[in-house]
């Protein structure tokens, strides 16, 4: 689900400060800014070019006045054959990150409306990007997700889907990764789930007054939430570090309440939600001056089900949460005061994030081997970035994987793809491989040792420029039944292990002990 933000220059949501603040820990990327572009500042945040974090795509400048700088450029991906287009960003392995993608179409391609496409994070299909309604209203769109890094390289990808028009190209305006402290959302098992932001609100905050960095040290954006309930100003400041999620103190400055003895009803968010499990955190603070009498007790229910009982709210603030709470359709929060409590319930802020099951994991050794293979190719396919197997349907071109406890690479087929470079020795670490078909390319160097590929059934390396000898270990692979090596520059004798076997070997006259003398098998 998208969240709307009017990013016009006179309505910058992030406060402008007289003194600069250091950026949050992570990356703020201005997509499509170009290799020589200087950093740009939005509020007091500094965004740098995305060059060096992605190797594919074209750039475009939006011809519209008074845009915030990060919306004035974008990167788009016209290559229809690529299964995905990925950013690769160095991170702390196992670290927890808030990922935000921002989109502003700006009619960059001359089309009638923005394209619709998928976004993928760490191999999991995260959501569909559909900015049509927002753009029609003059708005940009952003999406957020909290996910942990599987390795030292983090991937965020875009991909076409069946709603992407034939003349449309996925695009992106800005990409942000903010490193989160361990305590934040720590009741979620991030080895199994991610948290996709649905809504994050500060109740009673004036329209347009969005809370972000530096009030929120992680640059989470707290949208204003107004309704018909009375607004009160809180007279004491909370300490963010007293809360596991470290909400900004400013999110508690205003609250909504009701009269003594009455229930407080809040319909939030304003749109219906799909049936799913959600992480819900609600934040409260008594708005009066600190004293022994500044407290209030009430029960909280969501859609008629008890959420928390006897919530005792003081001027120090309080949060109640549920890590996996079922929601469907319209959501209503009802706060019912306890007997004899002299003041009505109050609520300051809230977060709802959808619990998103992760789409599995490719064996890390396979990922490392495939990345090394890619680095040894001079011109790998444009979608050879991110997870080689995941999500299913968006694996690397020419790569087929098998599902198990981990996804494993079982076929590598780049026949006639025009690949140059060499075969990395790490191909031997792809121990689940059944088929290697790399014929009809421009590969140089030697055939690496493949003695560990016990599942290998066919090896096609014909019509390349490979040199050296044929590894004798090929004859000891128990399942190998087909070897095509013709039309290379190989030398030496055919290994004894490959003579008098039932393996179908295609060599022609290119295996020579001397340049002029072919070897008889």
Kindly label every feature range from the protein language model:
Residues 471-521:
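Leucine-rich solenoid repeat scaffolds
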Residues 406-407, 428-433, 450-456, 475-480, ...:
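Leucine-rich repeat
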Residues 1-386, 392-400, 408-411, 415-417, ...:
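Compositionally biased, intrinsically disordered or flexible polar/acidic segments
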Residues 423-425, 444-450, 467-472, 491-496:
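The feature encodes a structural signal of leucine-rich repeats
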Residues 432, 444, 455, 465-467, ...:
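Tandem repeat domain/solenoid detector
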Residues 315-318, 331, 445-453, 500-512:
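Generic structural signal for short, solvent-exposed loop/turn connectors between secondary structure elements
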């Amino acid at each position: 689900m998208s969240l709307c933000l009017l990013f016009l220059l006179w309505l910058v949501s992030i406060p402008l400060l007289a003194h600069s603040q250091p950026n949050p820990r992570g990356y703020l990327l201005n997509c499509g800014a170009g290799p020589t572009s200087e950093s740009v500042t939005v509020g007091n945040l500094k965004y740098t070019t995305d060059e060096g974090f992605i190797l594919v795509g074209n750039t475009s400048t939006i011809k519209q006045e008074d845009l915030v700088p990060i919306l004035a450029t974008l990167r788009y991906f016209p290559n229809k054959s690529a299964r995905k287009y990925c950013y690769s960003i160095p991170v702390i392995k196992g670290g927890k990150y808030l990922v935000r993608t921002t989109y502003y179409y700006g009619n960059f391609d001359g089309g009638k409306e923005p394209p619709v496409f998928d976004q993928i994070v760490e191999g999991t299909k995260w959501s569909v990007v559909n900015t049509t309604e927002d753009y029609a209203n003059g708005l940009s769109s952003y999406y957020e997700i909290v996910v942990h890094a599987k390795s030292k390289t983090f991937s965020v990808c875009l991909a076409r889907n069946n709603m992407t028009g034939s003349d449309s190209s996925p695009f992106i305006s800005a990409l942000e990764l903010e490193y989160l402290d361990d305590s934040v959302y720590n009741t979620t098992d991030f080895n199994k789930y991610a948290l996709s932001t649905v809504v994050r609100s500060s109740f009673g905050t004036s329209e347009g007054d969005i809370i972000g960095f530096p009030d929120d040290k992680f640059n989470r954006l707290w949208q204003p939430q107004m309704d018909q309930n009375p607004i009160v100003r809180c007279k004491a400041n909370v300490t963010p570090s007293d809360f596991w999620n470290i909400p900004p103190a400013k999110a508690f400055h205003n609250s909504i309440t009701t009269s003594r003895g009455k229930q407080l009803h809040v319909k939030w968010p304003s749109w219906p939600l799909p049936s799913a499990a959600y992480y819900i955190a609600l934040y409260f603070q008594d708005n009066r001056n600190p004293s022994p009498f500044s407290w209030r007790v009430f029960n909280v229910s969501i859609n008629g089900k008890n959420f928390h009982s006897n919530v005792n709210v003081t001027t120090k603030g309080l949060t109640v949460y549920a890590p996996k709470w079922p929601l469907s359709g319209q959501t209503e929060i009802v706060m019912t005061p306890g007997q004899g409590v002299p003041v009505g319930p109050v609520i300051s802020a809230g977060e709802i994030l959808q619990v998103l099951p992760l789409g599995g994991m490719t064996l890390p050794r396979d990922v490392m081997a495939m990345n090394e293979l890619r680095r040894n190719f001079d011109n790998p396919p444009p979608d050879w970035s991110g997870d080689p197997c995941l999500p299913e349907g968006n694996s690397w071109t020419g790569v087929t994987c098998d599902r198990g406890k981990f996804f494993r690479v079982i076929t590598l087929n780049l026949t006639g793809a025009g690949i140059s470079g060499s075969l990395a020795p790490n191909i031997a670490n792809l121990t689940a491989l059944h088929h290697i078909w790399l014929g009809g390319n421009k590969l140089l160097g030697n055939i690496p040792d493949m003695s560990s590929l016990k599942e290998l059934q066919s090896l096609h390396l014909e019509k390349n420029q490979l040199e050296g000898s044929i590894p004798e270990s090929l004859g000891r692979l128990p399942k190998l039944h087909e070897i095509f090596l013709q039309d290379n520059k190989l030398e030496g004798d055919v290994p004894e292990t490959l003579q008098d076997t039932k393996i179908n070997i295609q060599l022609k006259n290119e295996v020579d002990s001397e340049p002029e003398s072919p070897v008889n098998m």
